[in-house]
Amino acid sequence: MSKYGDSMKIVWTNGCFDVLHRGHFEMFKYAKSFGDQLIVGIDSDEKVRNDKGPSRPHNCVEDRKFALECIKYIDEVVVFSSREGLEQEIRQLQPDVMVIGSDWKGKNVVGEEYCTELKFFDRIEGYSTTSILEKSN
């Protein structure tokens, strides 16, 4: 049984969320529309460095977590440090809906087997953390 109760519809999404931009906010709004509770998983600093390179993250995990907790669509934020940790979080939560970027269509999505429904969010043209950071350098 979920800690949110049987009647609550749980939605999960995850990512780095290093430099927040409109695309992220639109995705959180989209994700929240599918349920009562939106749980967001974020990569630890070490995982971001391993995945994106030594100059990342731009913001530390504490700051990224705090920023996400201030967003009205998000009900809880959890930190994970590995693919296995991500899978464990999703397995324990057993979300009704998982929302991920449409660039994951046709790929093996971590934790997909533990959710009831998988929804894809299309990237909003012109919004990218990488491009924001490149412009600022």
Where do the language-model regions lie?
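Nucleotidyltransferase catalytic core that binds NTPs
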Residues: 1-137
